[in-house]
Amino acid sequence: MKHELIMSGLLILGNPMMMHAQQTKTTTAESVSTESFSTDSNQAIRENLHQDSIQAIKENLHQDSIQAMKEKLRQDSILWEKQLEAVTIKGTRSQFRQKNGGIVARISGTSLEKEPTATEVLAKLPGMFKDKDGKPQAFIGGAPEIYINDRKVQDYSVVENLPVTQIKEVKVIHHPGAEYGNNVGCVLLITTKKNLQGLAIVENSGVLFDSFVSNNHDLDLTYTHGKMTYYGKLGYANWQGNWKEQDIATNYVSGNQAGDNATNYIASSTLDCKHSYYDRFYWSAGADLALTEKQTIGVKYDGYNIHQPMPFKMTSYAMTNDHVDDNVTGNNKFLYYDWQHHVNAFYQGYYGEKWKLNFFGDFVKLHTEQGQFVDEISEKNLANGVSEEEARNKFTLLPQSDGTIWGAKARANYTINDKQSLMFGGEYNYVKSESRADYTPADKGTSTHSITKEDHAAAFAEYSIDFKPFSLRVGLRYEHVDSRLKYLKDETGRTGIGRIGSSENENSETGTTGTGTIGTGTLQAISANTPIHRKYNNLYPSLLLSHQAGRFSQSLSYRSSETRPSFQELNTGTVYVNRYMRQIGNSKLEPSQRHDFQYQASYGDLFLQASYTYVKDYITSIITPDSDDPQTGYITWTNIDHCWNWGSFLGFRHRWGFYEPQVQTGIQQGFIKAISMGKEKGFHDPYYIFSLYNGFHLPKGWYLNLSFSYRSSGTYDFVTISSVHNFDFQLYKSFLKDKLSLSLNVNDIFNTKRHKTDGIYGNVRFQQQKWEDTRSVQLRLTYRFNQAKKQYRGENSAQEAVGRMGGK
């Protein structure tokens, strides 16, 4: 980072006015001499005259010198102001700086403020990139936990619709401390700009053109009067598109590999959706009150409603070696429906110069549905002489869940002295989730009904000390989890899981066999009907050692954490994927224990990150065949004894005149083993990422960006992912002193995004190809009147539980 101070006038070190004033005072005090009055004969008179004359002279000179000094000061002041007018300060200081174990990125007044959306801003921060869904993700650490003005973001659309010009700065924490939950690998703290009095309005609208036309609109109102701030938001988003997916599962039986006396059972399904759409309504309202200059309270309510039907045509076939056993066609539909209501309240107060207290409370009510409407017909059945109606497999499956969450959190910060501080607190969540899966007609499968209740309590503490150039942060987190799962009988009195399209099966206990197949009847190892009660009491230490020398900063951290299975992974309801594939949860999953080591360094605009992670009881998805029907497979989850991975990331961003490039590159390599085709096999092919953003600051405030992103092929768990790349174009312009902004984005210009996977677990090989319409043109218009910041500083204490229950 280079600093330049260029002055066309005289460069003066110090204040010349004060220098001259000091000289004037010295002259005034020492300019009167008494040597002319030193005659001996008139000593007494001289002494009297001497005293009087000195006093008079001093007074006269003092008055004159003061006037002269004032005039001189005035002239010097004028000269100094003229010199300052000629001063030009130029600098290209870095947009990023290390602070308290995190990286603070300036957004306001930088080129990042030109980005069209907050998502684009977050994806360009050190150590961040876009995932396959277009959301920001930490290359090391995964999906981030995001806060806006200390309030945890529960619905990502809040980030998507946050105007970039409202963002002041973002702090990136790649090694979260003891305060953050075990499921958090990265934290983004967004701080918005200072609040303005009066009414503030932000209207944000976007239109996206691909095979269809999609749009989104939201209106954000904030009113501040004195110590009170009221705000509300109302938004609607509609997305339309199409997609196509092909799934092929090959089950090798009676042999260790293809061609080695193995019988190959192949099942393939192609899902072709010509028109899928997504309607989302979202809203929020709240207020905060500054009780005093140091104490604030607030309350906020927010919610959403999502409706997403996806009709598709399905064509499937089943083969044994080279013989086609059956062809199945169908007109099916997925129907997703979700809603959520969330209330949050908070208190924040400062006490003296040393104490800061925060209290948060939450109540969440949410509902999710994943309806499936199946209407298929089998050529094999028709060939056997049955009627078309009898050959038709038609049913409805409705998995749904209702969740209730109560949460509370308290945190205290105490400043011991200017070098030491202490943070401690606790949190508690009560979770109740009721899940069921119902079939219509009832003889098409076995309905399930279960209730899960959890009590989750945690206490945490961190001690920080600064001994320049080093600083140390030591943390400890304690967690107690009491989880209870109970299966209920449905209306017919049945419990357990049956196969879709089959008659009800008895409750056998054959379980998962040594070959990885699912036994007849219920999946005992996956979904036993007996109640499950689990308790966990664990300690999780963390440590961060930082060092800073000028522009060079580095840190080394360690963190122990736990990843608990989501409610979807635990849910024993069966989800219909396609004619030959089902999905079912595993209620016996155990939490994964993680140990993360990370090194981080930055120098000016250069950022480096490296990590090593060891995971015990790693949770991963697998495919296992049905022993009665080797062409039918089940996607489920299981615990792997252990795995580990390492990764490294390098980023650089700098501006030279009108050109501002950003380069990001990284590598990830995982090491995991499994029995594959009868032999133990390691999966450890690395994959790389590379992205280049070319920003051009054009005349009259125009900003243009041409970008390229690439991800190589490599292994992720047991699956090999294909390489993918894309080119994007962006043009941005603001008007009316940034009150109005217009952005044009062309995504995936050459339509090159294609996703392919190929994986083997046990004796099953699974291949998938997925295509969706990713080439699009997006136009976004944002208008801001009296732009203001929401003062709400609440923090969602129930976010982890909401995420595990499938909430947004």
Language model feature labels by segment:
Residues A86, A118-V121, Q137, Y156-S157, ...:
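N-terminal periplasmic accessory domains that precede
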Residues S108-S111, Q197-L221:
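Short strand-turn segments of transmembrane beta-barrel domains in outer membranes
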Residues Q23-I45, H50-I57, H62-S111, D131-D133, ...:
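Short, acidic, small-residue-rich periplasmic hinge/interaction motif at the N-terminus
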Residues I405-K409, A458, I584-N586, E590, ...:
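Outer membrane beta-barrel strand-and-loop segments of large Gram-negative receptors
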Residues F212-Q240, N261-F312, W339-V343, Y350, ...:
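Transmembrane beta-barrel wall of Gram-negative outer-membrane proteins
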Residues K124, N149-P176:
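Short acidic/polar hinge/loop motifs at secondary-structure boundaries
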Residues S284-I306, N332-T492, Q548-S553, L606-A610, ...:
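Face-selective signature of the C-terminal outer-membrane beta-barrel domain
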Residues T448-E454, P531-Y536, E562-K616, I635-G647, ...:
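Outer-membrane beta-barrel signature, preferentially recognizing the C-terminal barrel domain
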